[in-house]
Each structure stands twice: as structure tokens, then as C-alpha cells.
Amino acid sequence: MTTYRAIPSDGVDLAASCGARVGDVLPGPHTGDYAPLGFWAQNGSMSQPLGESPATATATATATTRPSPTTPAMPKMGVRARVADWPPKREALREHSNPSPSQDTDGTKATKMAHSMRSIQNGQPPTSTPASSGSKAFHRLSRRRSKDVEFQDGWPRSPGRAFLPLRHRSSSEITLSECDAEDAGEPRGARHTGALPLFREYGSTSSIDVQGMPEQSFFDILNEFRSEQPDARGCQALTELLRADPGPHLMGGGGGAKGDSHNGQPAKDSLLPLQPTKEKEKARKKPARGLGGGDTVDSSIFRKLRSSKPEGEAGRSPGEADEGRSPPEASRPWVCQKSFAHFDVQSMLFDLNEAAANRVSVSQRRNTTTGASAASAASAMASLTASRAHSLGGLDPAFTSTEDLNCKENLEQDLGDDNSNDLLLSCPHFRNEIGGECERNVSFSRASVGSPSSGEGHLAEPALSAYRTNASISVLEVPKEQQRTQSRPRQYSIEHVDLGARYYQDYFVGKEHANYFGVDEKLGPVAVSIKREKLEDHKEHGPQYQYRIIFRTRELITLRGSILEDATPTATKHGTGRGLPLKDALEYVIPELNIHCLRLALNTPKVTEQLLKLDEQGLCRKHKVGILYCKAGQSSEEEMYNNEEAGPAFEEFLSLIGEKVCLKGFTKYAAQLDVKTDSTGTHSLYTMYQDYEIMFHVSTLLPYTPNNRQQLLRKRHIGNDIVTIIFQEPGALPFTPKNIRSHFQHVFIIVRVHNPCTDNVCYSMAVTRSKDAPPFGPPIPSGTTFRKSDVFRDFLLAKVINAENAAHKSDKFHTMATRTRQEYLKDLAENCVSNTPIDSTGKFNLISLTSKKKEKTKARAGAEQHSAGAIAWRVVAQDYAQGVEIDCILGISNEFVVLLDLRTKEVVFNCYCGDVIGWTPDSSTLKIFYGRGDHIFLQATEGSVEDIREIVQRLKVMTSGWETVDMTLRRNGLGQLGFHVKYDGTVAEVEDYGFAWQAGLRQGSRLVEICKVAVVTLTHDQMIDLLRTSVTVKVVIIPPFEDGTPRRGWPETYDMNTSEPKTEQESITPGGRPPYRSNAPWQWSGPASHNSLPASKWATPTTPGHAQSLSRPLKQTPIVPFRESQPLHSKRPVSFPETPYTVSPAGADRVPPYRQPSGSFSTPGSATYVRYKPSPERYTAAPHPLLSLDPHFSHDGTSSGDSSSGGLTSQESTMERQKPEPLWHVPAQARLSAIAGSSGNKHPSRQDAAGKDSPNRHSKGEPQYSSHSSSNTLSSNASSSHSDDRWFDPLDPLEPEQDPLSKGGSSDSGIDTTLYTSSPSCMSLAKAPRPAKPHKPPGSMGLCGGGREAAGRSHHADRRREVSPAPAVAGQSKGYRPKLYSSGSSTPTGLAGGSRDPPRQPSDMGSRVGYPAQVYKTASAETPRPSQLAQPSPFQLSASVPKSFFSKQPVRNKHPTGWKRTEEPPPRPLPFSDPKKQVDTNTKNVFGQPRLRASLRDLRSPRKNYKSTIEDDLKKLIIMDNLGPEQERDTGQSPQKGLQRTLSDESLCSGRREPSFASPAGLEPGLPSDVLFTSTCAFPSSTLPARRQHQHPHPPVGPGATPAAGSGFPEKKSTISASELSLADGRDRPLRRLDPGLMPLPDTAAGLEWSSLVNAAKAYEVQRAVSLFSLNDPALSPDIPPAHSPVHSHLSLERGPPTPRTTPTMSEEPPLDLTGKVYQLEVMLKQLHTDLQKEKQDKVVLQSEVASLRQNNQRLQEESQAASEQLRKFAEIFCREKKEL
């Protein structure tokens, strides 16, 4: 009978507690205090108020130290009675106040967890959750032992209400072995308010069968503990054992315990499955099982210890002892040596202490009611309980005392997960997945997506990803040839497969190795395989070797990995041919192993075969799956089995997922079907998926027995399948596993068909799995139906395979596998060993007995950092989705970074090492950023602070990331920050010498946090708004690579390289959709933004550049910028040939942001232009850095400029814009010379001189940031002015490779606008000599397009070398030339090609070095393929100077010197017949300003004709007199006016720079020159007054120009503003009149009527859009003089900016310029007229074609109808004949 004992009010000492008091229990790792006594229920089943831990009233663990006089105490019986009065134990307990494991109920554990934040790991509160491990454990305990019923307030109708009812009826019931971790993991019904009642077994059987062992054995155990620990601690350990929580996993019961319905994942006890009640019951009834009673008890106690370990290791008191180990050892999990590199994930979970504690538990495990049987049994019990509860007078069924008639199947109470829909109902012991669930992930972005249970997907259909799911991660050490291979098609991940099991097969079999077997006294039979292999020699440490080790125990978890010889302490010398003694390696890795028990295995095939079976027993590539057919109105098992024939909907489904095969003679996997006599049917369904064979047991294809309702022949097969598909026709009732009776069916996949047998047929899916099977993928999208397609088939088959793999991890199958493994090991240890010990030398080493033993030398520090396997650290990770901290293992291998939850033993995070972009280390914390800025947060465990340093070192070795930098950014007087940011958070351009630049921000940097807000959660617009509106802007950035390329995750990089725009988007952060939603920019229409059609046209010429840029091999080539995967660039290059590579990625990105102030994102067209311009600009910048970088920088600079999206070029171009005059003038030249001379001069001097001020130079210094040196000002609103700069960007096409991602994005930042805003000041600077300096750096960048050129960096360098003939000037011109080349080539290849030309042009360049535009021209000229480049270049120019670009860019910025020059209106691109003229025209904006893009155009069109004109323009622009004839020619060819700023910007700039510029005309020209230095060269100078070409080839333009002057630019010219220069250029190069970039303005002396000019301008604007297309059309050029042709091309390119911007500079220039400009206007008008006529003709042709197509379509339809009618008639005739026959 149950006895009651009064409990003192101050606390009750339970026998099991050993006198522990509630108050004595310390919080901490232990569970902490229990809930108030009033809430304690007998079995802890009673629901408890929030905040209180569930009472763990298990008899064993009942130290219900609740101070409640009203609560009855546990009865003192048997062992309990004797132990309870054990004073030492009581004292010990009180001292340590350690709650017994049993006490660690869910609630208590929850307290612990709260302490460690782990308890809530799964997001479930520890409070009275049914799954709480502690309570579960107790429930199991009570159930197994006494099955006593818990009563809420004591026994009904009994005074015992004031007493705590006893849980166990006899001492035997109290045995600790009964408290299984498994029990703990399962929620007990009592815990659930609505739970089913617990059942109690009456009679002696319950006490006798619980444990068939004498009590004496238990006392023996106690004595062992006492002998081991005579002090109070031993006592405490015992009490803890008695009270031990059945399972450590339970501790997280709320969080991830088995019963956790949230994750639906059972909490498993380490590797051992929790033992179901049934198992326990069996154990009771069959105690012997070949093990002595003592063994059984022993094992059960240790099992409990082991189970509690994982959960509350930290909280566990040192008193807990492991078998044979000191309590402290047992209390903590075993930690492997850090220098050991794990081969796979499960190896990281290997716990030697756990293996020792569980060594006896395997034999005790019993089969339990699992799978569908558990659900059906639960439903039967529920009905029985309900009826009995009713007879008990309304007592809560949870507390009724009823006898469980089927004691063997005493199931813990489980109510299911209340997750139902039309396909599936909630069911006890099962967990449902109905859509929207996603796998658990602790990363930051997951928190923003929602909790793990919230749908991640909502996709129309599941999408295949380059990333691996957490459950699919197995092998961590990946051979180089297999790392991140993207060539293989993406497929759904196969999950829960221990692929590491092939370690022995792949690395040992067939190679020299040694196997050792033995029986360890603590671990039982063990098997060790060890092998030494040579690695590549180390530069400093000589030969390198490593030891591969496999250590197998009874547990399924195996230790697999390797350790470097240098990382192993030994007394032997490292690196010798003989190697270290194997003993040293094993003792270091597994010090607890008794090495002396090992014996060498026999060298026979049997040993190898047995080891392979042992290791790979869990690997299977053959699966059998049942399919049940459920018709409308059906739901029961009998109904489904009795469906004799399949309906058409079912047949349709079967034909989709597999192939019907004839069984007779079938040779493949038959799944136990008869292939000889057809006894199991004649046909079956078979298929293969990812090398897995699947045979389906289809109910309608199996034999039907008319008189047998159970259809045993069918159920015999389907009932033994682990996974079953339930196919439901429309109208079928929801499925529930309660209707199925099978111990094996653990997973049901419900598929319902909609609109069967129609074209709109689709399927919906739901899954239900046994609660102890972990979740598996692929996740079902929320509210999604699948079309009938291969996508659905693959999804379903992957789900089926993963379902069976997951079910094998359930307790039932885990136990079976463990037993099998134990037998294998036992056989090997007993029958396959020799007598040779592992340390044979020790026997003869007698000297060691007397002489001093040689000390082992320490391992080389840090040697393991280069191991290929995963180095592991214990850390505490922040689970953002659940808001808790969890104990984890961090592993970093050569391929993966993974986090494993110690409690649930599952991977909770993984990413490729190539995906890591940076980290933020602190003294004890670490934030690791990956992908687009997502991150995980780690904290070192107590006393392991040095781990953070080791982790960072490992990240440096294995990843390409870098430490983050915190910056506080200031605003300028206009409120601008001075940089542009792309949609993916990378910085597109940085205003040179602006506050952001001074703070260290560089192009290519990646923003990961803005004002403490993670960028990964922001859209581009939100990013910009945050930057614009924050009072104090604090950012965390990840520096770019040395070449300026932004750091990106490898999938993002791969996507970009594929140049699929889609990929770009994939990499977009959750919030980071391309900022430019308008596709014009994204499409890379560039100028196409104003005219998408032209863009495509241009695309053809610019395609090469585009392709490269798109391919975005950033680092590898200038193309790199393109690599930014903006497939759009291809479009953009089309319109922007000159910026092909740069433009598309970098240019596009930048332009929109710059051009469009904050609105750049919103306006696609404008954005496109902006991007476009930025591209050239970037190119410019990049070339400049190239120079400054020298060979290295030339490459890096480009890469840097490009790589980041504008990289250096973008930076420089911006910078030039900012300091337009000097920058534009000098930089153009300087750049040219710098770029050109970068091979020779490398613009080192220029860098030094200008570099100081010039961001480019700086960028050189800091290659990472160099790309940012550009002058872009980030002010959010300044984007429009920057847009003009961006126009120069087109030269940066190389940069696009980086840009692809940022392309669209960069435009959005209002930064550019700011730049322009600051531009006025910059302009002034530009005017000053100093601009020259900046120019050089920017120039070099600008010239080559910097990053743009990156793709052709090497080419660029070559060009520079070629140009080197004119050392300073030539070098600069070269730089420009290369940039031009990039633009001209319109593809990185073009660039490369351009590089050949540049050599010729060097001389030209040298003469024209003064002109920034010249650089571009040079590119054109350089390319003897000028004609080929010339055509593209106009397009590019045009693209680079779209109207929007001009309008957006504030004139002031652009107007700086270079800008003013671009006054000449970009003529409509004339036929490229005259390459020089074309180039010239291109060089200048429509207004005649030199443009960077123009220079690109120049590349397309020969610049030779323009050389003189461009030269003049460049000279004037840069104010350098050094331009040589060659340079002049180059200048003419590639007018730098290509870069254009907004008219207003340019006008402002020009006004500032010079009076002439100030004039309205001057302002207009300024716009073109806004294009940046290059724009001056790029556009024909005809619009502008002739530049002072005369100038000395070397005079510097200004301070900045001085270095440039060295290059050959006249100092005097350095003063000239861009507009001025552009005017001058116009004189020098009449050819430039053709420039279509900006509308050229006539001189006042020209005698042109204003009205005529206005009309011309309007026409020009209109035509310009057309001309962009026509620019590509060389045919136009024939009509017009060569000069015109360039102009036209420029016009078309600049269509976006076509605003006729009168070039104020024109007035300044002699009438000649005006005349030239007038001529240019005439040419443009003529071109426009021609284009218009062509369009009209085309329209007529198209209309006629459309009419013809309509007629043909009508005719075809009629014919089709006639044919159908004939076929119908034939069919009728055929049918009639058939019937007649």
C-alpha cells in the first residue's frame, strides 16, 4: 500500500534525496528549486504554474525538497528507507545543494537552462511544458516503477491530502536504472492539463519485475561510491544518482526534449536513444539478458548520469561520478584535444565519458511501442481512461488511479502538436509538418524570418539552393577537388546520413594502416584504426605527416579524424621517415583509453570486411516505401487496404513518381517482393533518385484477398515499411496515424491530388512522423501546391529518403543498431586479434626502469591551424530565433563552419568557409559574418577566453574574411556622407578626401551594420534612409580585398560569375533586393535606361566587355567588376559600349545612385544612366589606382575599384568629379599618364603628388580601400550629382565584376549626389593644381576604368607600358588609354585588345596627357581596333552620359574644370565611319565636355582623327601643356567629356572654375565634362572652344596637375576648368563636333540664333535617345564626316544626358570652337534626322511584317482546325470498324 509521511514545513528530506533540502539545492547548473509544494504532484504530472518547475516526484529522485507541511513525503521503503537516513549523504547534499538528476525536472532544468539560456534552446519555456525533461523522467520513472497515479492534492477522500503520495510501491521500483533519459525526454500526461492519466501497476509484479536484481547489488554500488569518495561528496553523488534526472536531454525538455512538439524532435540521450517505457518494462520482466543484476543497476545509474550530463554539464556538481571516474570527470562531457581535426560532424559529438556510462545500458534496452502503434495504443488508452475517470466522480483523468491493462506498453502521455489541416490531424506521439516549417538555425537572419516553426518558405515551389541544410552536413574534411563544386546540378540535400562512415573505406582500406582491438575495463570492446600519411612539406617546418585515427566503441558515435605529427607531444623527433610511436598519438588523442588492452588485429580480409560492416551498417542506398490509396470519404487502415483497384488519379500519380516494372525476373532491388512466382503481384513501382534505389509497395499492386478485411498479404509488406505515402483523392478524410497499427511505420507522407487528370492537376503535401524521429527536409513551403512536374517528383523522393534516414535515428532503430554494433565489436575483440600489443617496445625497454624517463617535447603551437579536418571549440552561441543561449561545439574545417547543439546533438548552423566575409572579435565574444552580412554570435565558455583568439586565427587560415572596422561618419556642409552604397551593402564610391574617405572608408567595403542595425535585414531604400536620417552615423564595415573587390560569400560570387542576374538577386540580403527595382538600370541598359532598345543595340558592340563584366571574375581580371553578376550589365554595355565591363557592373550600380539623389533607386532610367556613368568613372578610377598601385595596384587598383562596384575607378571618377577641375583636367591626363605610365611611371609620382590628396593614391596605399578612393560623396541626397560622375564610371566596366551585385545597389545611395554637391568645392580644387594630383590617381583609375579595366588589368598594364614611351604624359595617357580601352573594348577583352592599341597611342597619349578625356581617347586610339571599339565606345559614352545622368548630377560637382568643357552637346552618334571624330565626339558630352565614357567610345571609334582635337581639349581640361601630338590624337579619339554631370552641376562647376565656365554656356559644357576627366576627352571638343592643346606636354594642371604636368600636361592648363578644356578640345578637334554626348553650344560669335539653338538642342535631346541606338549603327557615320560620326555616337550614348548643355566654355573659346560646335549640332541633327527616317522605314516594314504574320497565323489556325476535324473523323471510322470486327 502507499504510505504517507508528513513533511516538515521547512523542507522534506526524501530518502532518494539523501536528505537534500529544497532550500539547499543551489540554482546553477543544477536544476534549482522546484515549484512550490502546493504544486507538486506525485509523479510530477500535475501541471504547474508558470515559473515553477514541475515537481519531479519520482520515487527515486523524489528529493522533493518542497517545504510544504501539506505535501506528503516519499515513503521510506527498501533501499530508500535505508538511504534516506544516511547522514553523510544528507549533509553532502545540503552542502552541495545539488538537486538529483531526477529532481532536474523540466522545470528545474528550465531553471538551469534559464541560467545557461540553453534550456529554452528550442524556444520552449522551461515552465511546465509537457516535454520538460525532468518531469518526463519522473513520469517515466513512476510509470515504469510503480506507475503510481499522481493526485493533485493527495489521494481523493483521504487525509493524505496533506501528504505527498508515494510514487513507488517498492524499493525495487526505485532503481535508478528505471529513470531513463528516454523517459525524461517524453512528456507525461499528468504534466499536460488535458493529458491522459498515468497508470499504476498493482501487485507484486510491478515491484519484482521492475528490476530483476537483488537489492544487494544496489548497495554494492553505493559501497563503490563510498570507497571512491569517502567524503560527503560521494554521498552527494549517490543522492544525485538516486534523484538523477532520467535524461539530460530532458533538462532541455522544454527546449528540445523528445517531447518537444515545437521542433518535433525528441531529445536524445547523447547517442543512446531514450528508452521507451515499454523497453523498461521488458527489462524488468527479463532482468537477466545475460547481465548480472549488479550490472543492470550499475548501468542504469550511469546511464542516468550520462543523460544528465549533456544537459546540465555546466550546472552539474562535481559530485556526480562516472563509472570508474572521479565525480568531477563524470560531471563534465569529454572534450577532445583541440589539435585533433574531426573528419565529420558526429565525431565532434563523441563523448568518451558517455560511452563509458552507457556501456551496460545497451543490453538493458527493450523494444517499446513505437511508430503508429504508439498512436493507436494511446488512443485506446485515452478512451479507457475517459470512461474510468467519469466513474471516479469527475476526478481529473490525469490523476485517476487506473490500472494499465497493457503494462508492457505503458506509454508516456503525449498529446501531439495540435498541428492539423485538411490532409492531416494531430495525433499523440506524432509530430506534423503541414507547411511553413524550416530547419533550426541560430543565425541572425533567421530571427528576422521568424521562429523555426514559422514558415521560411512561402515559395511557389521549393527552390534548390547552393547551401546545404544543417541535417545534410556530415563530412567536414573535403578534398580540394571536391570543394564547393558548382558544376554539379543543384539537388535536394539527402539528410541524416552518416557519410563519415566511409572514412575507413576511403582512407584506410587498401593502404598501409594498423587495426587494434581490445576490451577496455570501462569502455568495453573497442576497435582502433590508425594510419600515418605524408602531407605537403611546410616551408618552415619541413616534412609534414599526420595520423588518421578511428576509435570505435559500443556507441554509434565514432571518433574519426586526424592529428598532425607536429601537433602531437612526443619524446621522438618529428618528421622522420619512421614516424612517432602510435602509442604517443593515441594516448594524446584518447588519454582515457587503456592502451595496454589493445592488441594488433589479424591481417585478414575478414577483419577488413567486419570493420566495413561495422562502420557502414547505417549506410543504405536501397529503400522500400509503402503507398496506400485513400479514396474520397475514407481514412481508416482497413478501407485503404481494401481498395482493390487504383483510380485514374492514383495511376497518374504513380506514373509521375516511378516506373511500373514486371516483378518476374526483376534483377534490381525488389524489397522482399517475389520475383519468381508472382506471389506478391505481377508488377510493382520502382525508381531511382540520386543513386538511391526505391521500391514502392503499392497497395493496389499487391495481391487482394476478397474475404480478408485486414488484407494481410498487403499489410505484410506495407506494415513493415518505415515510410508510407498516403495518396488521397479529393474528398478523402484527414489522415491520422491512430488508424494504423504497426510498430515500424514511423513516417507518413500524405499527398492529396487536386484537379486530377486535368492540365491543372497539382498536389499538396503534409508529413507526420514519430515524435522521436528528428525533423527532415526538404521543408514543405507554406500554402503551396506542386504542379505535376519533375520538381514535385524530386521533392517527394528526397522527402521519402530523408524520412527513412530520420526514422533510423529514433530510439527503436537506434537501439537495434547499437546492439548489432556491440556484437560486431565483441566478435572482433575476441576472435580477430593477435598477441602483439601496441607498445611492444615497452617490454624490452628495461633501461627506463632505472634511468630518467625522457620527457615529451611540446607540440608545435598552432600546428593544428592548418589541418584540413574540423578543429572544435566549446562555445556558447546565441540562438536568435529563440532568444536564448545554447552550449555548442564550433567546428571549422577546410570547407565548413558548423555549430552543433550539445543538448540536441544536431547541427544548428553551417556555412562554407568561402562564405565567411569577416568577424568582430572581443575579449570573450566573437561575431562571425557570412554571406551578405548575416552573422552568428559566439561567446567563449568560462575560463576559455583564449579560444576566441584561436578561432580567429583558424578563420584567417581557412577563410578569406577579415576583421571588421567600426567607423563614425560625419556629414559635410550639405549633409552628405560622401559615399555611395549598393543594394547589397557594398560601397560603390567614396568621395575623395571627404569625411568618409578620411575615416578610412574605401570602395568595395561592405557595410554590415549601420547604427547598430544589421544591413542584412535592410532593403536598399531602408539603408539609404538610415544613412540619410541618422544624426550620428556609426557603421561596421568589412574592408575589401587589397584590390578593392568587396568580400562576398562564395555562392554570391559564383552567382555573379555566372552573370545571371537572377543569381545576383539570390545573393541579395533579405532586405537587399537590388535597390533599383527599375530594371532599366539593373538590365544594364545603361544609357538604355533612357532607351532600352539602344541598350540592346549597344550591347552587341559592348557585349564583350559586358560578358566579362558579367562573368565578374573580379580578382582575376578587370572584368571582375562585371563579375558582380549583373546580367543587366550586358544590357547596359549595349548602350554603354565603352563601359562594357565596368559599366555593366560598376557603372550601372553607381550611376543610378549618383545620378539619382536618393531617388536614384526609384528611377530606373536615371539610375541606369547614373550607373552607366559611374561605370566609366569607375573605370577611370580603377586605371588611376592601377597606376598608383603600380603593377600590383594597377591590377589591384582596377580590381579594387572594379571589384567593389566602382572600385577605384568609381572612386576616382567620383573624386574627379568632386574636384572636377583639377581632377578632371589633370586626372584625365594624370590618369592617362598614370595609367599609361603605371607600367612605366605607374603614376607613382603622380600618386605621390596627387595621391596625397587623391583618394586613389590612398587607395593604392590601402588597396582594400583603394576602390573607394573615388570622389563620390555619399550624401544620400547627392546621388544625382554623383550620377554624372558615374557616367565616367562606364569606363570602370572592369569594376563591374564586383559591381554586379552592387550595380543596381550603388546607385541608390544618395552619396553620389553628395559628391556632386561637394563637387563645387571639388571643382575649385580641380581648378587648383591639386586637382591634378587627385586627377592622377583618379586619372589612372579613370583612364583604365580602373577596376573596369580590371578584367583587362594586365592589358592595362601592358598598355601603360606601351604608353610609357611618353613617360609622364605617356604613362598618364596610357592610363587613360587603358581605360578607354576598357570602354572601347566595351569588354574586358576589349580592354585587353585596347591595350595593344595603347602602345601606339602612348605617344599620342603623351602629347595629350593633359586631357583627362585623352585617357579615354587613348583607349580608343590605342586600339587600332578603334573602329571596332569606336562603335562600341560611342554607345558606351552615350550610355555613360544619359540625360538622367546629367540631370541628376549637380552641375557644381561636374562642372569642375573637366565638366565645363563638356559643353558641347553630345551629337547623336554619327556613323562611326570616322573613328576619330566619333571618338572625339564620344570623348565629350553632348555639350562637348570630355567624358570618360566618351573615351570608351573613342576606343570603339578610331581616335586618330581626333587626336589633335582631343589633345587640345584634354590640355585645356587638364591644363597641361605637355600633351604631345600622340596624346592630342588620343584625346581627339577619346574625348574625356564622356563623363558628364548634370547640367546644373557642370554649370556650377564651370562657373566656379572659370568665368567662361561660369557662363551659362560654360555650365552646360560642364555637364559633359562632368563625366569626369574622361568625359572631356571622350566628347568631341568641337562643342567646346579648342583646348590649349598646344600646351606643353608636361606642365601640370595644378597642384594636382603638377605630377600630371610631369606627365606632359601644361601647368597652365591645370587651371582651366573642365568645361574650358572641353571648349578648347572642341577647337583642337573639330572631329569632336560629332560627339553626341552633350549638346554642343555655339560661340556667341557663331551668330547662331538662340531659338535655333534651342530647337537644335531639343531635337538633339530627342534624337539622343535614338542615337544611342544609332551610335552602334556605323551606317550613320558615312553620311557624316568622321568627326560627326563620333559625335553622333556620343550623342546616342549620352542620350540620357542629352540635355543640350550649352558649353559655357565655348564662349570662352574662339569662334572656331563655336563653329565646330555648330557644325557638330548640324551633324547631330542630320544624324537624328537620318535615324528618324530609318525608324519610320523600320516601322513601315514592321507593320507589313505584322500584317503578314497575322495572315499566316489565321491560315495556320484554319489548317489546324481542318486537320483536327480530319483526325476526329478518322478516329470515328476506326472505332466503328473496330466495333464491327
UniProtKB/Swiss-Prot annotation:
Compositionally biased tracts (Low complexity): 54-73, 1196-1210, 1266-1281, 1599-1609
Keywords linked to the UniProt accession: Acetylation, Cataract, Cell membrane, Chromosomal rearrangement, Coiled coil, GTPase activation, Membrane, Phosphoprotein
Residues the record lists as Phosphoserine modifications: S100, S146, S401, S1364, S1544, S1547, S1619, S1622, S1677
Any one GO BP annotation for this protein: regulation of small GTPase mediated signal transduction
Coiled-coil portions: 1720-1774
Phosphothreonine: modified positions: T1387, T1699, T1703
GO terms under cellular component: apical part of cell; apical plasma membrane; cytoplasm; extracellular space; glutamatergic synapse; Golgi apparatus; nucleoplasm; plasma membrane
Domain Rap-GAP positions: 611-828
The keyword Transferase is assigned to this record: no
PDZ domain boundaries: 966-1042
Name recorded for this polypeptide: Signal-induced proliferation-associated 1-like protein 3
